[in-house]
Amino acid sequence: MGPPGRKAIKKNLSIIKKENSIDFTIINGENAADDGRGITKVIAEELFSNGADVITSGNHIWDKKETTDYINFENRLLRPANLAEGSPGNGYGVYFTKNDKFKIGVINLMGNVFMKKTDDVFEVAKRIKRKIILKKNVDFIIVDFHGEITSEKMAIGHFFDGVTTGVVGTHTHVPTADTRILKKGTAYQTDIGMCGDYDSVIGMNKENSIKKFLKDKDAVTHFPAEGEATLSGIIIDADHDTGLAKKITRLIYGGSLTK
């Protein structure tokens, strides 16, 4: 979320990757811009240089106009696959880890409930499942499901159970406590939270957010809180033979959420 989140990535991600022998890193970057809305080419390249292998997104993907051009030639930046047909960029892709050791499928989807108009997420998910197949054309598959409500996220988790390595929820900015491996072997968490200042209202300045709710005439457009960010996410340890999860660990690193 904004500059504090990017600062936390720059400061801590390389340490976390080294300590945990991480092969592949996915960051949802749709709130990475300075105002917390969208992402730019410069910021995406900053995240790549600081350790991201793929950047996923959600409903804020088009908040910066330049993204519509950039996403067409940068295949490591994904937008939700169930946006309207003909949208710029791609909603899923296949990538290699360093030294071409593993082949990773990454799928970016967005919920239909309480979100901007999107194509039916389950219909699109069915089509993608036929194209990216665990242990046939990829070693591992991760799904970023950007959604508003818990029930829809849980449903998509069970829908992908046993055919993907992990399904992780994004969008609500607060990490949930249901980190687990589903019955057929897919790692799951309803929402992995944000990399941002948690002494805030979902990453935005708390005083201004309260003014907004009170309809105070002095309230201004929401802007990110500026305190120390917590780096929030998950680490999945997967079985190379099956492509399924062996372990999922919730990651809460630094900032006010750990104090």
Task: Annotate the PLM regions.
Residues 1-259:
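Acidic, metal/ion-coordinating pockets
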